[in-house]
Amino acid sequence: MEAVILNSGKGSRMGNITSMQPKCLTKISDKETILSRQLNMLCELGIKDIVITTGYLKQKIIDYCETLKLPLNIKYVNNNDYESTNYIYSLYCARDIIKDKDIILMHGDLVFEYSVLEDMILRDKSCMKISTTSKLPDKDFKAVVEGGIVKKVGINYFDKAYEAQPLYKLNKTDWNIWLKRICEYCVNGKITCYAENALNDITDLCQIESYDAKNKLCAEVDTEEDLSIIKEQLYEINNRLVYMCFSTDVIHSGHIAIIKRAQQLGKVMVGVLSDEAIASYKRFPLLPFSERKVMFENIKGVYKVVEQNTLSYKNNIEKYRPDIVVHGDDWRNGIQKGIRKEVINILKEYGGELREFPYSYDKKYIATERKLTAELAMPDMRRSRLRKLLNLKRMVTALEAHSGLTGLIVEKTMVEDEGGIRQFDAIWISSLCDSTAKGKPDIELVDMTSRFRTIDDICEVTTKPIIFDGDTGGLVEHFIYTVRSLERMGVSMIIIEDKKGLKKN
């Protein structure tokens, strides 16, 4: 996909601001101009091929783009007749390098939110930005929309029309149809009208859907008054609170990428799940909360890091009232589906928004998680974890297992409960069930070596702490050796009892 930015005009309505520079170089904040904002967003969203049409003070645009040092492939097409033509002619000048491609088409004076551009890029079909909530302008673009399809675009349409901006995502087929009509207009001398005049002739031949940005920022800077309004809106956007939550022990490139995307939406607050919250639904954390918190505090652009004590977002959303909550789209299905629903309902109460980014199913991330899980299964890690859980939760839940398969049931079983997720904390290896599985009426008839094989089978496929039912413990003289063997295998606890006679199954 390629982006086409129209920057040939003078922007004379801006007065002294554009007397010495093109309008696209107008500063809209301390750190960015209109053009730098557009290019940075395109770069963040993976669009590296850019075509910029120039005209008025063209060299200033070229020199400025070089100072940005962005990893972009920018081509410049100059419209020498910029003073006597409209942007339809600039597109005609660029026709040979912009045809036969999917494109993002925008005017060079457009300022928009990151989420507006992102949403349009992610759509499968061609689309144009409209707003069903904005007031119809008197002199600017409006789009006539029928059944979600743009039928007419211009300044004189009012019936069945919505406020519109010249920001398009166009698939190759639709764009080629429009570009062909643009070329026909220019060949016939129609070079002072809008390119949308040509579009209006062929809307029955292409399908351009309306993308409703509603109240999100997407506006042209035509006057100094427009500039003042947009600066205020950008200040509000940059100070919006964006909330994310993490449970990871290791930060990889996928986490950094999603944080950087979230930073485009406002100030990022990271919620770090407490050790207890993670242990309640996932593997036990390798790093304690305090270290994971510091880890996120040292990521550039993270505004604040707070603790999230439960898997449910309810308490933190109600406390901090973020404007936007960001999460991967993997929770739309599965065990966290109910938590997602709760987040949506709470945000609706005060007008908050949920933004979901595509989850990264990269093989290297999956391999990293498997490596961490394997470390948890190591005897030293497994053995010490029961004590940590008891210190953390005071009470743990265990379920009996007597084979690799039943061990997997204990390991994987999770249930949603009141906005959270519950799972078993430990595996109980029962002497009664172990002997029954081996067809023996009493555990005293089962050799300890045989029981050790059961533990090996379970350890091979699980990571949770193991509590071993040692029955009587056998001979007192042998018990110390039994305990040492169990410790080497990673067993966290052995329970013995005093009994007389056989306990028949």
Which residue ranges define each predicted feature?
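Nucleotidyltransferase catalytic core that binds NTPs
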Residues: 235-379
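Hydrophobic faces of well-ordered beta-strands that scaffold small-molecule active sites
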Residues: 270, 397-403, 425-429, 466-470, ...
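Conserved core of the sugar-phosphate nucleotidyltransferase
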Residues: 113-189
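N-terminal glycine-rich phosphate-binding loop and ensuing alpha1 helix
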Residues: 1-54, 58
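Alpha-helix-loop-beta-strand connector modules within alpha/beta enzyme cores
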Residues: 441-468, 505
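Conserved beta-loop-beta/alpha segment of the NTase-like Rossmann-fold superfamily
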Residues: 62, 66-141, 145
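Conserved alpha/beta core of the MobA/IspD/sugar-nucleotide pyrophosphorylase nucleotidyltransferase superfamily
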Residues: 1-3, 163-239, 362
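N-terminal amphipathic alpha-helix/helix-capping segment at the start of soluble metabolic enzymes
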Residues: 376-417
